[in-house]
Amino acid sequence: MIPRISRNAVKEGFDTLPAAICYFDRNGLLRLINHRMQEIAAVLCGRDLQTLTDLEQALRSPGGGVRLRDEAARIYEFPDGTVYHFTVRPVQDKYGIPYTEVMAT
C-alpha cells in the first residue's frame, strides 16, 4: 500500500526547494508559490504577488533596486548581489488543466 502524502507535507517540500517557483492558473491568478519566490517577488514587485500580469510588469520594469542584466535571457541582479534567471513555461496537471510555471534559479 502506498502511503498518502498530506497537503502540508507537499507544501513543506515545495517551500524548501532551492529554486524560487510559482504557478498561475489559466486566468493568471497565483495558485501556488514557495517561500523563496515570495521573497523575490516582494523585492521585484514591491508587494505580495497576486497575478501573472503583476509579475510580467515587474520583470519588464523591475523595482526595488533590481537591475535587468540581460533582457533576452531574463537575468536580473537583486540589491543583495544575487542574480536570478527567470523562466516562464506552460505546464499541465495530471487532469490536463493548464498552468503557467515561473521559476527563478
What feature does the model see in each segment?
Residues 47-81, 85-87:
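Terminal output helix/cap of sensory domains in signal transduction proteins
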Residues 2-32:
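Sensory modules in modular signal-transduction proteins
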Residues 79, 91-97:
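Flexible loop/coil segments at beta-strand boundaries within sensory signal-transduction domains
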Residues 41-45, 86-90, 96-105:
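PAS-family sensory domains
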